[in-house]
């Protein structure tokens, strides 16, 4: 995505995986965001870092939002697997992969991880996967619907994605 100007929703999506610490152990979280609006389109938690939970997140995003033009990821084995890349190609999606070790190529999803962890995850000690799923789900709704982004002219991801603005009452 380095030389592409992203100017509309669903032009480019990004995916990444992060660790979610628990009171005992950790879970893996995958999320797909719209590059233009920063909207979290789908996400999944798993206790294993396999391709299936990434495919579930992809299928959910495609079902609700249709295919993007471009899909960006790092070179993780889940995203380079034949099953995952074929799912993208089957929908006519152009695949873009970051350079090795270039987290800056996926800066918006890295920013999501930072916000999620400092505003939610690190403030809690989830005791069960179900608790983590509920609390992270609540945060994702907040992130999309209520959290203003300076880079979006202080609009929320939903306002930017759907082209709406709030008006003072």
Predicted regions and their residues:
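Charged DNA-binding/catalytic regions of mobile-element recombinases
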Residues: 1-169
């Amino acid at each position: 995505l380095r030389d592409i100007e992203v100017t509309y929703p669903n032009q480019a999506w990004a995916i990444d995986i992060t660790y979610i610490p628990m009171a005992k152990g950790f879970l893996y979280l995958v999320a797909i965001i719209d590059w233009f609006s920063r909207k979290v389109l789908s996400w999944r938690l798993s206790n294993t870092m396999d391709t299936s939970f990434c495919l579930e997140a992809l299928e959910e995003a495609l079902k609700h939002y249709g295919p993007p033009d471009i899909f960006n990821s790092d070179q993780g084995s889940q995203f380079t697997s034949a099953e995952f890349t074929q799912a993208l190609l089957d929908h006519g999606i152009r695949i873009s992969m970051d350079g090795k070790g270039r987290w800056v190529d996926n800066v918006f999803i890295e920013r999501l991880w930072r916000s999620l962890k400092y505003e939610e995850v690190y403030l809690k000690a989830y005791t069960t996967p179900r608790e983590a799923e509920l609390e992270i789900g609540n945060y994702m709704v907040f992130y999309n619907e209520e959290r203003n982004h300076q880079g979006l002219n202080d609009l929320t991801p939903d306002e930017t994605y759907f082209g709406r603005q709030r008006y003072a009452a």
